[in-house]
């Protein structure tokens, strides 16, 4: 249903935002960028 697809979209957004945040954090910590 609509709510299921909305929930899946939110989860997808959260995952990609989390990955980006983790990459940025790791970059700042170990200066690998």
Curated annotation (Swiss-Prot):
GO terms (BP aspect): defense response to bacterium
Summary of the tissues where the protein is detected: Expressed by the skin glands.
Keyword set includes Secreted: yes
Disulphide linkage map: 27-33
Cited Pfam families: Antimicrobial_2
Stated role: Has antibacterial activity against the Gram-positive bacterium S.aureus ATCC 25923 (MIC=36 uM) and the Gram-negative bacterium E.coli ATCC 25726 (MIC=18 uM).
Localization: Secreted
Keywords: Amphibian defense peptide, Antibiotic, Antimicrobial, Disulfide bond, Secreted
Family of the protein in this entry: Belongs to the frog skin active peptide (FSAP) family. Brevinin subfamily.
Main location: secreted
Keyword match Secreted: yes
Name listed for the protein in its UniProt record: Brevinin-2PTe
This protein's GO CC annotations: extracellular region
């Amino acid at each position: 249903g609509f709510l299921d697809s909305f929930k899946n979209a939110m989860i997808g957004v959260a995952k990609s935002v989390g990955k980006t945040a983790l990459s940025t954090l790791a970059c700042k910590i170990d200066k690998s960028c």
